Amino acid sequence: MLGFDIDGRRAPPSLKNRIVLSLSSDDDLTADAMQTLFDTGSQQDAAEFGAALAAPAVTGRYDELRGGAAALSSASLAPAWRAFFTQLGSVGFADLDRRADALQRRMRENGLAYHPHERAAGGGAVRPWSLDLLPLIIAPDDWAAIERGVLQRVRLSNAILADLYGEQTILRRGLLPPALVTGHPGYLRPMCGAQAPGGTWLHVAAFDLARGPDGAWRLMAQHTQGPAGLGYLLENRLIVSRLFPRAFRGLHVQRLAASYRALLQSMQALSPARKNSRIVLLTPGSHAATYFEHAYLARYLGLTLVEGGDLTARDQRVYLKTLRGLEPVHGILRRVDDEWLDPLELRPDSLLGVPGLMQAVRAGNVLLANLPGSGFLESPGILGFLPRLAQALLDETLTLPAVHSWWCGEQAACDEALPLLARGIVKPTFPASVQAGGAGGGGGGARHAGGQPGAARREPEAARARRAG
């Protein structure tokens, strides 16, 4: 999703997401003089022409172009979109086909793709990355509300993790059913008693948001382990901004670079060696679905891209294997989910992690972003309990609401949800391995009233592919 991005010093970790540099002579696609059937006569006419061309949203949906519910919105464009089409001008309309071709060409040249699970399993398929020509424009007031809500939810997640791996007052007070926490495989007992550097469990998080017919944003899902998107966001922004340079300048779209600097600086500040820290990016490998962005993000941030076999843990410290010998590692930005991080304490069949990594993390000798143990927060069953947790832990009301959801492991919630079944989406509370009788416990499903399921970023297929290869 492209839109107005916030300054990096205030950037919510979830929305600092998605670049590859590709400079060519036509990158800026300035408005060349040309004969066109779309000669609207003036810049203002271009905005009216855009409004006439754009089909209205489906009834019951929010009309982004016109800024209102489909049945209630006027025929005119929302101010931000009017400004965009005005900057585009009449020649810009005539040039849209060429810009669309340029977008596809740049994605191919930059290798921008998503590798679906079947490729990792040996199918060889590569899914082209999907990117719309026109960006989603989020007005400053809307973005400020999203920013406040996301930052608040990150603070809440940090407070929940600190409590559940510490004093566990949440469970003692009955604010969360134990089955949703200790029964979930994402709750890692090896992290009990661990201290998060600076109180920060989550350095990066991702939130799936949707806008309702009333224009309000709602949370659909949250991703807390090693969420994907930071590299794709940058690539999307670079490509689209070069296709519409005048519009991006005219709308004063906020920059992204400061957000990435802030992420790196915060990791340096919290890692053992501070500014002299060596930070690496841990990837499952080239079979991972989002390996493209792992490689790009490491290059953009100036980090060494490593796999589990490139690291070793000795004496509660982590080292990088080099031709010059072992070199200390002080920070790890990971793109490997929790269960695969350490075969000694987590999944014994993992080939993606580092034996002894968990011990080094608990000893405080290496910063792991994000800290392991937040997987249970990704369960859709927990969403309905977050408002009262915010009141209990932060003494605040959540400003960014989630879709209405019920955890059907409680009889009262199940009775309330069943009559609404035809209008909602049923999601599993626990991963498939637990549903099939694997490790973990508890049961029940989570039901959402409306929306689309948000798929958590999982990459165990890389381990299967590596074992097969």
Predicted regions and their residues:
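Preference for protein termini
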Residues: 2-7, 15-469
